[in-house]
Amino acid sequence: MEFFMSARKESRKNNRVKLGSPLRVVMGSIGADVRYDMVSRNISHTGFFLDFEKPGRFPFTSASIMEIWLELEEGSTIFFNGKMARVVYPNDEAARETGPGIAVRIVQIDSKNEKTLFEFIDRKIRELQDNRNNVA
């Protein structure tokens, strides 16, 4: 299985999508049996943001490399490895925009899962633009 961070990511604008319905996220340490079920409504080509009321209780550290399964829609789950990119505490200025939580960065993804993620995000962006155009 081929893993890489593609040049496509570097050359494309990092489009972030804020979804109305949450996506299911399952995370665990590499090789561990313990899994954590979480949700995200905020994703991009390079990672996602987990809503987490008490981010200080997040079960991973900034050094942890995590196995992550992200369910984009029913029947479409992608797998990749990620790392904690930043923590937003409830009293942080950034929490006004995002709320408290944890930003997770994709560090390793295979080409098939990456393609699925790009297509999902691009489709969601088009849907949001279409909805805005229909309202206007």
Task: Report residues per predicted region.
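N-terminal helix initiation/capping motif
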Residues: 1-56, 118-136
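Short beta-strand-centered aromatic/proline hotspots
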Residues: 37-38, 80-87
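Short, conserved charged micro-motifs
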Residues: 57-60, 112-115
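Well-ordered alpha/beta subsegment
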Residues: 107-108, 114, 118
